[in-house]
Each structure stands twice: as structure tokens, then as C-alpha cells.
Amino acid sequence: MFAKTAAANLTKKGGLSLLSTTARRTKVTLPDLKWDFGALEPYISGQINELHYTKHHQTYVNGFNTAVDQFQELSDLLAKEPSPANARKMIAIQQNIKFHGGGFTNHCLFWENLAPESQGGGEPPTGALAKAIDEQFGSLDELIKLTNTKLAGVQGSGWAFIVKNLSNGGKLDVVQTYNQDTVTGPLVPLVAIDAWEHAYYLQYQNKKADYFKAIWNVVNWKEASRRFDAGKI
């Protein structure tokens, strides 16, 4: 689950609410990490985690908060002056909300999806999730192989998500997205893997396949199992 600082700002009636309907809203913030920056070494370096969290993720936090503020201001303006020009401005701001909001939520999922080996990182899933993986993919290794294929297929920047699809009886699937697009609606993200260069380049340089292979040593399958059982993040 999201850390308290993020959850308090986003959770409404048990779900994820990115836009407040009140005149005054609480801005989103970086989530608390449950481990130190260096705790995922040697698979992900402390330097990468520190920059990823304090610089890149913070940029999405700032960008999302700014975009939501601008959207609310434009909403008020459009109510007073319902012109095509103001409508176009709102459309443009929605694109920023989608990008920075996706970056914010994707990274919140990403940090929760990781854990050092001392906290169970890399340990295979158990229970209902393990059974579903075996039934659909034959083994965890086959699911990881499929996910890595999706990650390798990202041209430029993007993500791969292992999801539970609530629209087809809760079947598992692997979804590839570009830039900071996220999964929504009936797709419950169980595992989110960042394929942007900032997630690996300082350590793995152009050998991103090595990063895709290494990260599974610190994937938090306990968190994935919790989301699978709950049917929500």
C-alpha cells in the first residue's frame, strides 16, 4: 500500500482520488520509503535510488500539484468565461495532469513493489497469487520472462505492469505503457517496473536487459499478493 503521506492525500472512500473536489486541497507528497537508498544493492545502487526518489519522483509531485492548481483556476475561469480559448487551456492542463499524475502514482507503486532481501525482496509469491501465476503462465519464471519481453519492447521510456484484470474474472496480464501512462479502471497494478533510463542508466548504462533481470531479486511479492487478494492498491 502507499505510505501514509501519500495515502492520506489520495485516498477517498477506499479508492484512489487524484483530484480533490473541495476548494482547498491537500497537495500530494513523496511517500515514505520503508528502506534506505542503499538497501537494494547490488541490484539497484543507492545513488540511483536517491536520485530517482529525491529528484525524478519529486519532479512529478511538483508537476502534478502545479497542474491541478492550474486546472482548478481554469475551471473557475471557464465558469465565468465559457470561451473556446479557456476550454483549450483546460485541455492542455489535463495533459500535464495525466503525465505528472502518472509519474507520481507509478513511482509510488514502484517503491512499494521493491524490498531488500532482508525484508523478503525476491522471495516468490505464495497463496492465491502463486496459484494464479502457475495456472496462467506455468511458473513464476515464465511470467518474469514475459514481463521482461514487454519491458524490452518499450521504445524510449515507459513501464510494464503485472495486473489483475477485474473485468475478466481477475485474470493476470502484463501491460506495457509509454512515458508515464499508468493502468486504471479494472486493471489493478500488482507489480510496476520502471523502464525509463533514469531507473538504471547510472549503474547498467546501455545494458538495460541486465537491469530487467536484476530487479526481480528485490521485487516485493508480498505487496503484490496483498493487492491481488484485495483487488485494489
From Swiss-Prot:
Its cofactor is Mn(2+). Belongs to the iron/manganese superoxide dismutase family. It catalyses: 2 superoxide + 2 H(+) = H2O2 + O2. This is Superoxide dismutase [Mn], mitochondrial. The modification Phosphothreonine is found at T147, T149. One of its GO terms (molecular function) is manganese ion binding. Pfam families: Sod_Fe_C, Sod_Fe_N. Residues 1-26 form a transit peptide. It is an enzyme of class 1 (oxidoreductase). GO terms for cellular component: mitochondrial matrix; mitochondrion. It comes from the Eukaryota. Its EC number is 1.15.1.1. Binds 1 Mn(2+) ion per subunit. Destroys superoxide anion radicals which are normally produced within the cells and which are toxic to biological systems. InterPro entries: Fe/Mn_Superoxide_Dismutase (IPR050265), Mn/Fe_SOD (IPR001189), Mn/Fe_SOD_BS (IPR019833), Mn/Fe_SOD_C (IPR019832), Mn/Fe_SOD_N (IPR019831), Mn/Fe_SOD_N_sf (IPR036324), SOD_C_sf (IPR036314). Present with 10900 molecules/cell in log phase SD medium. Homotetramer. It is found in: Mitochondrion matrix. It comes from Saccharomyces cerevisiae (strain ATCC 204508 / S288c). Keywords: Antioxidant, Manganese, Metal-binding, Mitochondrion, Oxidoreductase, Phosphoprotein, Transit peptide. One of its GO terms (biological process) is reactive oxygen species metabolic process. Disulfide bonds: none annotated. Mn(2+) binds at H52, H107, D194, H198.
